[in-house]
């Protein structure tokens, strides 16, 4: 979704403004907006300070909860949209087709990723089969106030957003931790399985021993064709931690890695302590985010970093329907363009190997012209590179083609 104009729907943008006590158009110089901006800065400062006790305090404060929902909720929500795009690119994953659909947001906060799913489905209603009778939305969070807020915002969203009338939406929110008990879990009715589980900014905060216990529980909670998505902020430390959790899930469960890694192996980014695997999302922020950025000097409109892993319970792996190259010829771009006089370079990875590519300006051709447009996160098909000591050289005859973004 690098090249797409990712935005919030007008429905959600207005709901979040209303929840924060604001109206449209946003008055950038109003006392309420200036106060909201200061509260966003407080949230950022406390997170950067690494105070582990602050998260609970943040969501128990109504003022800070409003600031978070108005600013950080959309910033985090949009990270899910390209991940869902990538999931439903698969020709055999046709959306939600069973009569009963269940979706779980672990550590749901004020409803961030459930709202992300709803935003995506509102824009892609072909993914909702006419055979669906009921869609259960589940949110679990340790903070009571989050559960209350999520239920309020999502209920209002469903009341005003247009969805097929044949389906019934039911909301289930629970206050507690998925990590405080075994399986079956007291927060979840026995036998419940989910078609989609999303955990955002949750598991990188727990120790490896706890996650090794939790991993098999996540597997049991997934339906036979279920998807598990882990998302985190995309910092160096959190992304490297997320890779460790990826490896533990692959070790302790039968889940398979769908994306972003194209092959299963030791992540090459761990070889260098300065490296980390992350994406950067381009979007058009809502007006309130623009205004807050101007007040406090943030630049969310320039892009949002994030890291993610998508797992499947049915063995499916990411494929590109329009790609006629064998899988071993498909790689993912994992760096920005490195431009020097007379040449361009970038790194690609397939999950097991990381390669540096170089193309001299004199070697630009029809078969490799996509190289200049490649962005971090793009899947690319490549062939005919010439191995040099420190890189793979792209010749005029080499093929470098960007697949569907």
Regions found by a protein language model. Give the residues of each.
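C-terminal lobe and adjacent flexible extensions of AdoMet/dcAdoMet transferase-like proteins
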Residues: 291-405
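N-terminal auxiliary segments of SAM/dcSAM-dependent transferases
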Residues: 1-54
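Conserved SAM-binding loop of SAM-dependent methyltransferases across substrates and taxa
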Residues: 110-130
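A short SAM/SAH-binding and catalytic strip from SAM-dependent methyltransferases
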Residues: 194-209
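A short glycine-rich, Lys/Arg-flanked "PGG" loop and its adjoining helix->strand segment in the class I
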Residues: 212-224
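Conserved beta-strand signature within the Rossmann-like core of class I S-adenosyl-L-methionine
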Residues: 225-232
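Class I SAM-dependent methyltransferase Rossmann-like catalytic core
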Residues: 54-91
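S-adenosyl-L-methionine
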Residues: 148-187
């Amino acid at each position: 979704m690098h090249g797409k104009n990712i935005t919030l729907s007008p429905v959600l943008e207005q709901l979040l403004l209303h929840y924060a006590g604001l109206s449209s158009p946003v008055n950038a110089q109003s006392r309420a907006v200036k106060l909201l901006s200061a509260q966003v800065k407080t949230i950022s400062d406390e997170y950067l300070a690494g105070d582990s006790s602050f998260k609970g305090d943040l969501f128990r404060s109504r003022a800070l909860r409003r600031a978070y929902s108005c600013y950080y909720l959309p910033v985090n929500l949009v990270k899910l949209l390209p991940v869902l795009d990538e999931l439903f690119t698969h020709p055999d994953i046709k959306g939600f087709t069973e009569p009963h659909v269940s979706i779980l947001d672990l550590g749901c906060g004020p409803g961030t990723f459930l709202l992300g799913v709803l935003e995506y489905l509102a824009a892609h209603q072909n993914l909702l089969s006419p055979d669906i009778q009921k869609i259960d939305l589940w949110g679990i969070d340790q903070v009571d106030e989050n559960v209350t807020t999520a239920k309020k915002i999502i209920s209002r969203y469903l009341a005003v957003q247009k969805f097929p009338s044949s389906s019934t939406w039911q909301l289930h929110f629970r206050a507690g931790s998925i990590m405080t008990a075994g399986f079956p879990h007291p927060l979840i009715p026995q036998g419940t399985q989910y078609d989609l589980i999303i955990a955002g900014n949750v598991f990188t905060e727990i120790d490896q021993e706890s996650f090794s216990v939790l991993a098999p529980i996540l597997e049991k909670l997934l339906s036979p064709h279920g998807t598990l998505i882990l998302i985190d902020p995309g910092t160096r430390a959190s992304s490297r931690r997320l890779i460790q959790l990826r490896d533990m899930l692959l070790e302790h469960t039968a889940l398979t890695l769908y994306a972003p890694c194209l092959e299963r192996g030791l992540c090459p980014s761990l070889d260098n302590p300065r490296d980390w695997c992350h994406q950067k999302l381009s979007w058009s922020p809502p007006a309130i985010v623009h205004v807050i950025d101007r007040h406090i000097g943030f630049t969310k409109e320039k892009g949002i970093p994030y890291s993610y892993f998508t797992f499947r319970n049915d063995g499916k792996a990411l494929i590109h329907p329009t790609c006629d190259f064998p899988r071993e010829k498909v790689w993912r771009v994992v760096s920005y363009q490195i431009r020097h006089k007379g040449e361009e370079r970038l790194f690609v990875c397939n999950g097991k190997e990381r390669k540096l590519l170089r193309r001299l300006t004199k070697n630009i051709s029809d078969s490799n012209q996509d190289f200049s447009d490649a962005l971090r996160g793009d899947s690319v098909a490549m062939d005919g590179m010439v191995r040099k000591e420190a890189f793979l050289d792209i010749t005029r005859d080499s093929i470098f083609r960007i697949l569907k973004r």
